[in-house]
């Protein structure tokens, strides 16, 4: 997506054509907002607009090259692009089924910091732990993330993992 809303599927089409020539099937991997923690595959228009697409921050407020998972703008842009890709795949491959699977995201997480400390993340951290998570973990204790899980690195990782999972 070189420009917002302008999709170029030439590479996707080329991969499908090549796979068909060799009687192969494809499993695509959607990196979207993150790849191995970083937002390196996000389009340039996302990378350049840190106001619309804020970055994650370390505990010391150092900005990271990681778009925050707490940004609805990021989620909506990622969702639109993914939906357009899936519509395109359906249009070009619904008969031959060359693509047999789409893996959504891979190795998301944070390096350098266990969790995001951006203003959006801090707001979520001060909120009560979502009831569905407490239920899934069979926890009776209610409260904020710090009250329920403590304040160590493992607690921070639980917080971040939950919100990455919710995003995806």
Regions found by a protein language model. Give the residues of each.
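Aromatic-lined substrate-binding rim segments of carbohydrate-active enzymes
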Residues: 1-55, 89-90, 168
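Polysaccharide-binding and catalytic clefts of secreted carbohydrate-active enzymes
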Residues: 42, 47-168
């Amino acid at each position: 997506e070189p420009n917002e809303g302008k999709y170029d599927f030439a590479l996707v089409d080329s991969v499908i054509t090549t796979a068909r020539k060799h009687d192969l099937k494809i499993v695509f991997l959607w990196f979207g907002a993150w790849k191995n923690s970083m937002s390196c595959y996000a389009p340039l228009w996302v990378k350049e607009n840190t106001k619309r697409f804020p970055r994650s921050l370390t505990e010391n407020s150092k900005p990271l090259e990681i778009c925050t998972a707490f940004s609805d703008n990021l989620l909506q842009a990622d969702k639109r692009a993914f939906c357009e890709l899936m519509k395109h795949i359906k249009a070009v491959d619904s008969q031959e089924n060359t693509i047999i699977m789409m893996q959504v995201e891979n190795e998301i997480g944070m390096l350098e910091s266990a969790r995001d400390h951006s203003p959006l993340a801090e707001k979520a951290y001060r909120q009560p732990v979502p009831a569905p998570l407490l239920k899934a973990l069979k926890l009776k204790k209610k409260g904020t993330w710090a009250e329920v899980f403590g304040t160590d690195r493992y607690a921070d990782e639980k917080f971040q993992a939950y919100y990455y999972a919710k995003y995806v």
